[in-house]
Amino acid sequence: KWAFDIGGNGWGNNEKQFYTNADTANAIVKNGMLSIIARKERREKKEYTSARLITKGKAAWKYGRIEISAKLPPGRGLWPAAWMLCNNIETVPWPECGEIDIMEHVGYKKDSVFGTVHTGAYNHIKGTQKGKDIFIENPYTQFHTFAIEWTPEKIDFLLDEKLYNHFANEHKTSAEWPFDSPFYLLLNLAVGGNLGGQKGIDNSVFPATYQIDYVRVYQKD
């Protein structure tokens, strides 16, 4: 159900990596576990390589519980994420299409993860995004469960079953709530960028591995 986003265009965030296409140096499944590996190597004018896996065109979901079990890579400049974008992003541009960040982590904030929504009304360009962070213990040595519970009324963000961000449907317009259509999943490890690179990049941390044990989607019949 996974494909690859490919390239080194900065991805709207001034990211420093080039995302490769199904290169086992950057994405490999072993013993049922996915590893996304960022490396310090030059590729098409970028100084780093990594991978970004997407279910776009293969699978998308509307509502449900989406859960990822992962172990995060340590290091300043790293920016692992598990997130969702609307299937209609080709016709409805970001941020109007909506974005759900199930988990983001930046290496210079070792003990925090973030859960955020972006919409036309609420996004980081305006500084109005609806995000919160939560303390995380041992993110680099233990697997943790990152989840959202998404209904027509709300999106809840959970770390190891602990609720830390609640985004309610205010029943205004799609600018506030574009979350009534299918979204696809993305898993990536970025290097640098507007969020990940705020404190620079520590080149001693490469290669860096973001390990994903599973991704599960639960939906009511």
Predicted feature locations:
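GH16 jelly-roll
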Residues: 1-221
